[in-house]
Amino acid sequence: MSDPNQPKPTSERHVPVLKDRCINLLAPGIEAARQRGETPVVIDATLGMGGHSEALLQRFPDLHLIGIDRDEEALALAGERLKPFADRTDLVHAVYDEIPDVLRDLGVSEVHGVLMDLGVSSLQLDERERGFAYSFDAPLDMRMDTSRGQTAADVVNNYSEEDLVRIIRKWGEEKFAGRIANRIVAAREAKPFATTGELVDTIRAVVPAGAAKTGGHPAKRTFQALRIEVNEELDVLERAVPAAVDALAMGGRVVVMSYHSLEDKIVKKVFQTGSKSSAPLGFPVELEEHKPELKTLTKGTEVPTADEIAENPRAASARLRAVERIRARRAA
């Protein structure tokens, strides 16, 4: 009988979202590499606890996987999980917009697949001391990379009221941003914020109780905004998606799962731009360099099935998009 006080194995703590669909979407890019006599290389740009990577390595015995994560704890756990495949993996402590640097350091010129599973991980939500969750009291941190950068406490204690309104409204899409920012500034004058519980209580005091019926937990949107600000998530994503596309070999694929509309808008824009002709309006012919570089593989976004959501409730808000490179990369 297992000891309830012992941490669960990584495989039990993390259920990969849309795992089978992700693997099936990446498979043709891997097969295209094989047909050219190349060793297939796939980047898991948001490695987390390694669930998607483990499944890829199990299915494709000749695959070389590059796993990237900014969270050192996640890298360590994934490293343990992927030990049986150590000779076919490179695990790198980096942010996923650093794909070009990672590939250069590894001597890799192009890859045949890139997977991105955005947002906060199960590990980060479950580890109380990380401060990502509003459901229990913890230090107000929210850094995905705990080795550097400002914390959520730094943001709420030092940002001006105007800046707090801006990020809570923009990143959290919170209609009560003004009320929340005003109360935060008033409360921190008496005592700086140190824990998530203190912040939750402050938000509860100004968000109408009825708002929770449609918007969920009153602190949900503010916590999202702070997490995005602390980790510069959307700025990173705006650089990361084009970098992933640029790294693709012919026939290679990028698969991205996003969890809120702000992320999905960025992914959609890059994919749509690459999937359209770049010929000037009214141009009489479409030259080769004007033809689309990408082919869209999903009609809009794909979502988890009811069965998958029942097994893994955190998958409920996942939205998947995928593209394939159909024209060679432009020369640098």
UniProtKB/Swiss-Prot annotation:
* InterPro entries, A to Z: RsmH (IPR002903), SAM-dep_MeTrfase_MraW_recog (IPR023397), SAM-dependent_MTases_sf (IPR029063)
Offer one Pfam family short name for this entry: Methyltransf_5
Record-listed S-adenosyl-L-methionine binding positions: 50-52, 69, 103, 117, 124
What GO molecular-function term can you cite, just one? rRNA (cytosine-N4-)-methyltransferase activity
Q: Name one GO biological process term.
A: rRNA base methylation
Cell compartments where the protein resides: Cytoplasm
Cite the entry's keywords alphabetically.
Cytoplasm, Methyltransferase, rRNA processing, S-adenosyl-L-methionine, Transferase
Per the UniProt record, which EC number(s) apply here? 2.1.1.199
Q: Which reaction does it catalyse?
A: cytidine(1402) in 16S rRNA + S-adenosyl-L-methionine = N(4)-methylcytidine(1402) in 16S rRNA + S-adenosyl-L-homocysteine + H(+)
Taken from the UniProt entry, a GO cellular component term is: cytoplasm
Q: What is its main location?
A: cytoplasm
Broadest EC class assigned to this enzyme: transferase
| NCBIfam families listed in its UniProt record | 16S rRNA (cytosine(1402)-N(4))-methyltransferase RsmH
**Family as reported in the entry's similarity comment:** Belongs to the methyltransferase superfamily. RsmH family.
Q: What does this protein do?
A: Specifically methylates the N4 position of cytidine in position 1402 (C1402) of 16S rRNA.
Protein name per its UniProtKB record: Ribosomal RNA small subunit methyltransferase H
Per the UniProt record, the source organism is Arthrobacter sp. (strain FB24)
Tell me the organism's taxonomic lineage. Bacteria, Bacillati, Actinomycetota, Actinomycetes, Micrococcales
| Gene this chain is encoded by | rsmH
